[in-house]
């Protein structure tokens, strides 16, 4: 496994974000995947990081117990012995499930992650090699700038916003130390979204560069009086086809790596939104409650974290699908009709694009796209309506009991 800077410009650019994610126990440090690290030092680093992950997991279990105790005290205080208890306990349990899943994923899929890094580095070099005969320059944004604006900025927002949104939400039964540790855990959970988006953007950059080579090839076929270079251009077309096939397989590996962690993140964020709405309704009768705006911010934040994941995946798929349009444009050129070798190569490439549909999935459990996010919003709105109906009935019953006790 290699992640040397000389091998891959993409992985070198992504390294700082991977380091931050490793601090929160989400992914192994990038140094573990370098051949320059001596075996003894690698073993010491891995042993130390394993102990660090165990400490994080123990902290999560401890805070799970503290949060459950605080939840029961809040439920007893507001007399809401209904589904609020079940929903709250399930939401707290999902935190433990996600943290445990992350640690097991690092342990069981360590080799798969190394292969993913290797394939990204090899694809990076392969695309550079296939484009060396073209003099045109790409006009897309700098990859470093794209990561800074999309991943870096969002990670800073997550780390900065979560403590403000959760401040004082746990009530008077929660010690400030537990609150700080809980905030760290919540940051860790939500950073799983940017981690996934980082890999999506790596794939996106590979597709952009592969498409750019194809566009340059099209320009050469338009301007060049084909003859001597037609065989060279056909070889470039075949290389481009093979690279796209490898990118498709890479996306499949990434989906398998993030299968359970992303599934649990979607489930946790959806359930937490319902949990926040439920407590917003319960606390609405408390004149001293000052956290309603924070609850609205939490709902928006949790939704937006999932939206970004779906949005980047959708953009990547659309860019991949645009390659078929470029192939059809090349097929319409007079050169494609003139040279049988080029015509057959285009036909094979187009058939491959028709069969290898790019989909970002959680290991085949569901597709990550804007359609998923829209369906999730509709489902949540339906559950919110049900919660509101139940709470209206509860408030009416409480009011009736109070009136009865006052008259008696």
UniProtKB/Swiss-Prot annotation:
A Pfam family matched in the record: 7tm_7
Superkingdom of origin: Eukaryota
Gene Ontology cellular component terms for the protein in this record: axon; dendrite; membrane; neuronal cell body; plasma membrane
Residues carrying a glycan: 403
Residue ranges annotated as Cytoplasmic topological domain: 1-42, 114-146, 205-261, 318-367
Annotated family: Belongs to the insect chemoreceptor superfamily. Gustatory receptor (GR) family. Gr2a subfamily.
Protein name: Putative gustatory receptor 98c
Gene source species: Drosophila melanogaster (Fruit fly)
Gene name of the encoded protein: Gr98c
